[in-house]
Amino acid sequence: MSQSFTPRPLVIAPSILAADFARLGEEVRAVDTAGADWMHLDVMDGHFVPNISYGPDVIKAMRPHTTKIFDAHLMIAPCDPYLEAFAKAGCDHITVHAEAGPHLHRTLQAIRNLGKKAGVSLNPGTPISAIEYVIDLVDLVLVMSVNPGFGGQAFIPSALGKISDLRAMTAGRPIDIEVDGGVSAAVAGQLAAAGANAFVAGSAVFKGGTVESYKANIDGIRAAAANARGEMV
């Protein structure tokens, strides 16, 4: 391995957006059993992104079905008025977009004051310099490798360079680098080699519709990433 840092643990975070919403609790339990590390919760408002998903009440309803980390990705603007509601709903990580408001530093402070881990998400066209001066408040950086709003899009290859630059920027800090968009076993190795350690996958995890298929899908992504890091699984 060429990196000089101690790698962050590998994390597979199924995107609940790709689950069967008619069986949401059952689906959460299924991916938990299948080996998910985090549950990635895509919150969309139809304003910041061109789609609407779910809010704190639905997340609260999911919370009793798993003890795994709830990794909330707020694709909403403004986000500050809603941070407390998502914290109370049971989210462990709250990630906001660098592009969603003018006061990112204040927003990250607010998340941490709620006792939650604070994340920043970067759209494909947003440079990593957007977080340079708030890095001390960041626990997680979420790199969008598709344009946010819809699942099932194709992976944008330029995300690899951004991830590599982010890993250099965050070297020596306990910051997770998470990637979301078009993630599958086919690209997980490249992403891990670039420096990502947390992988959001929606359709690539939920295809098959059974615990067994979800486990095979999660295991495939994990194995590809681990292999690229020279690790055994």
Residue ranges and their predicted role:
Residues 1-18, 25-26, 226-233:
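N-terminal amphipathic alpha-helix/helix-capping segment at the start of soluble metabolic enzymes
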Residues 10-16, 39-41, 62, 70-74, ...:
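Hydrophobic faces of well-ordered beta-strands that scaffold small-molecule active sites
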Residues 24, 31, 42, 86, ...:
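Conserved, mostly hydrophobic/aromatic
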Residues 28, 80-88, 126-137, 182-199:
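Catalytic cores of alpha/beta
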Residues 41-110:
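N-terminal active-site wall of soluble small-molecule enzyme domains
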Residues 94-102, 142-154, 194-217:
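Glycine-rich phosphate-binding active-site loops on the catalytic face of alpha/beta enzymes
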Residues 111, 192, 207-233:
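C-terminal helical cap(s) of enzyme catalytic domains, especially alpha/beta-barrels
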Residues 121-157:
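Histidine/lysine/aspartate-rich catalytic loop segments that bind and position anionic ligands
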